[in-house]
A protein has these predicted regions:
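Polar/charged low-complexity regulatory segments
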Residues: 1-137
Length: 137
């Protein structure tokens, strides 16, 4: 994850917060920034097998986080992707609950709201994240 991406998405998340009035605890907001920065230039983020099979074959916290993050990214950035948005939300929530920490239990509980917020960050912000990449870092 590049620092420049983190800086861009920190600004985007701040703008979305101001526009929507949605305020998350700081650790959730940081998680959204990190998630977007981590996925921005990845083209191989989808599971190798189906989402359902990936859920059934979670081996550890890392694979649970990867699947949860993928579902959160897909539902926020590509809300019309695939079968049904609620399918990916359900799988993402289930993956995050397998980690059983306060952070991931919170992300799981508020998954649809966080996903909608990510959608605003990427598609509905007055500040277009793509324009921010034109900055000379």
């Amino acid at each position: 994850m590049q620092d420049a991406y983190v800086a861009v998405f920190r600004d985007v998340v701040s703008t979305a917060r101001e526009q929507t009035g949605i305020e998350f605890p700081l650790h959730i907001e940081h998680y959204v920034v990190a998630l977007l920065a981590e996925h921005v230039d990845r083209s191989d983020f989808l599971p190798k097998s189906s989402f359902a099979e990936s859920l059934l074959t979670i081996k550890n916290s890392r694979t649970a986080k990867e699947l949860g993050d993928t579902c959160l990214f897909v539902t926020g950035v590509f809300p019309n992707y695939g079968i049904d948005r609620n399918y990916y939300i359900s799988i993402g929530q289930s993956a995050y609950t397998r980690i059983d920490t306060e952070l991931f239990n919170t992300v799981s509980a508020y998954f649809p709201t966080i996903s909608d917020f990510i959608n605003v960050c990427v598609h509905g912000c007055e500040t277009d994240p793509i324009q921010l990449y034109d900055y000379d870092w």
